[in-house]
Amino acid sequence: LMQVFRQHNEDYEKQVEAGMKAKGTLLKYKTVYKHLQEFLSIRYRVKDIALKELTPAFISDFEMFLRTDKHCCTNTVWLYVCPLRTMVFIAINNEWLTRDPFREYEIKKEETVRSFLTKEEIRLLMEGRLKNAKQELYRDLYLFCAFTGLSFADMRNLTEENIHTYFDE
């Protein structure tokens, strides 16, 4: 399992470097890889397991590890189980695995209600004094995204070349 995951992450990283895949997704894969390493070490006292040992019980145990040891909520668990499912698909497609352990496993994402800042809360955020320059930078970046509608992921990839003070060029 971990060998498949490691190779997947190496290939994915090359695609990120080529601009074909998102860096944020790679970070998620790397995080899940680390959690799986820790899970295997703690629960099974091994560094890797054979693909044929992937069972619905293994997946449920990993889910419980994420909930209890890592204190993940349902939607984070769902987000972290998806890359494991991707590794299973890779194994099935390469005929390294003949059955899908996820066939008997189900986790549903919970519906979340997003809250929004009021104009007054935004004003307080804009005018508030923060403890240090780093907090002020994060506040300013948040406000930039809030006022422009730019996503955090897009803002993270923003470069000086993307910013124009006028559009006559």
Sequence positions of predicted segments:
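Short, aromatic/basic-rich helix-turn unit that serves as a nucleic-acid recognition element
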Residues: M2-V32
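A short, basic/aromatic helix-end/turn motif that makes direct DNA contacts
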Residues: N157-I163
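Short, intrinsically disordered, charge-balanced linker/junction segments flanking boundaries
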Residues: L1, I163-E169
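Basic, Lys/Arg- and aromatic-enriched nucleic-acid-binding interface segment
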Residues: T74, W78-C82, L97-F152, R156
